[in-house]
Amino acid sequence: MRFSLLLATCVALTFSYTSNAEELIKLQRNHQLTLTEVVRLSILRSPKQAEIQAGKGLVNAKNIQANSFLPSAPAVSAGLQNDAVGSNRNLSQWEVGLDLPIWLPGQKTARTTLAQGAQIELDKTSANLSLDIAGQVRDAVWSLGMAINEAELQDARHKAAQDLLADVEKRWKAGELAKTDVMLAQNGTLLAKAALIKANAEVKHAEHRYWILTGLKELPNTFEEPLNSKEMIDDSHPWLAESAAKIEIANHHRSLSAIEQRENPQVMLNVRHERGAFDSLYNDSVGVAIRVPLDAKVRSAPMMANAEMAIAQAMSEHEQRQRLLESIS
């Protein structure tokens, strides 16, 4: 009964794994391909590259804002006033105005510093992405290597079981062994066959994971690489450098928020073309006015609170990363 069950299981595994194997990619060794090149290509096809490209756009936008002649967009106004509906004394007034915001003290410098910090943060994020992808590639290739070694081991065991079965059958036919010995040998052969099929399937699965990650149908010539001479993790580690850059950018945001607690002052220029009541002639004039918004908690309190929260979150994340790396180093 057990022999029949093992035989049925082995046949089922064979058809199942053969069917799956037909859908997987057969990888070949490329003696010109290096592990470094595999990592580079994997980084380029990472879905997180979309975030990096968006980050470049954000840095560019911050540079535009910092290098702008004005801190925000100007505004144009136009108006007409007459007494046609009212006293009807021939009053008429046309006015066109231009509102120009002006920089607050230190605002332009703070925005420039923020743009520079955003570029540094993006560079650190890109470096951390490279480290993360490199780790995934290493896991993929070494998992594949281990799966290949396991398949070779199971193949050797299966061949040994077949040789043993042939010898036992020969000795049974010669009357030296009982039929039960043959059945035990057949049972061992089927177990070895099932293990071999499973090991080969794991190779296919590992190849598929490698292909999904790298997009390559080729394996590097060797999985080995020189060992880094560093023995201790310091602040230059990409994971820590990224979180440290987030702290810096949060500090820059707080500095800018402290300056922008009130709105930008505005210089308002206007040209007026008017005719007074009962007058027949128009008078043209030019006016200048200054608008200075006042500081109020209704505006500044949420801005500073958000800035402080961002700093606290960045520092907390950095501390967590430090502790995690220290625990595994």
Predicted segment positions?
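Cleavable N-terminal export/targeting peptides
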Residues: 1-31
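Bacterial Sec-pathway N-terminal export signals of envelope proteins
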Residues: 20-75, 102, 176-179, 211-255, ...
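Hydrophobic faces of stable alpha-helices that mediate helix-helix packing
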Residues: 32, 56, 116-119, 123, ...
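Amphipathic alpha-helical coiled-coil segments and their boundaries
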Residues: 38, 45, 52, 101, ...
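Histidine kinase transmitter module recognition
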Residues: 66, 129, 136, 174, ...
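Small/polar-residue-enriched beta-strand and adjacent coil segments characteristic
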Residues: 72-129, 246-248, 253, 260-322
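Periplasmic alpha-helical coiled-coil/stalk elements that build and connect Gram-negative outer-membrane
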Residues: 130-242, 248-250
